[in-house]
């Protein structure tokens, strides 16, 4: 084989081999991809560190999560406090000068009759039908215990328009003395409060009374101890 034919075979073999895509342009592309991958990894690592150490992230809540529920409720309370109520309400107190009886008064400090409620014949007259909270408190006071058993009762009664009969709505009985004070022993004072309260459906014109069986034991030493009232709901 001549030298020329050998050179020609080598050239043909080189042409048959696939050409590489390297060179300066391929090197730059690989360098760019490597740099881009490094930046992505570095950025992800930095973000993880910032989140882990609390440098960035969701801000802490300074208010309750249910603030959206509290705000309307607070606004409703504020608006209702600014708006005068037209619901019937009454709060009467005992007359400390009435001896031997429980007499209710509305022309005293911290007493009121509003929106149609009347105090007539020592009874509260309901101005409209509806649900009412009825309440009353009395305070009894004594000195020592007599030989006879002491029973103290407190009752709230209703005389309805539909049936003219007194019916007890709430009632309580208490006995402050368990045994008689021995003769010659010191007669110690005792106190016995009774509170009554409940919700009832009332009709227009119903009459309500709060009564006791032993007015001689009532304690009027402080104001606000004996009272009677209704609140429309």
Swiss-Prot record:
The chain crosses the membrane at residues 36-56. One of its GO terms (molecular function) is tumor necrosis factor receptor binding. It is found in: Cell membrane. Residues 88-233 form the THD domain. The keyword Ribonucleoprotein does not apply. The modification Phosphoserine is found at residue 2. PROSITE patterns: THD_1, THD_2. This is Tumor necrosis factor. GO terms for cellular component: cell surface; external side of plasma membrane; extracellular region; extracellular space; membrane raft; neuronal cell body; phagocytic cup; plasma membrane. Belongs to the tumor necrosis factor family. A lipid is attached at residues 19-20 (N6-myristoyl lysine). Homotrimer. Interacts with SPPL2B. Disulfide bonds join 145-177. Residues 57-233 are extracellular. It is linked to Psoriatic arthritis: An inflammatory, seronegative arthritis associated with psoriasis. It is a heterogeneous disorder ranging from a mild, non-destructive disease to a severe, progressive, erosive arthropathy. Cytokine that binds to TNFRSF1A/TNFR1 and TNFRSF1B/TNFBR. It is mainly secreted by macrophages and can induce cell death of certain tumor cell lines. It is potent pyrogen causing fever by direct action or by stimulation of interleukin-1 secretion and is implicated in the induction of cachexia, Under certain conditions it can stimulate cell proliferation and induce cell differentiation. Impairs regulatory T-cells (Treg) function in individuals with rheumatoid arthritis via FOXP3 dephosphorylation.
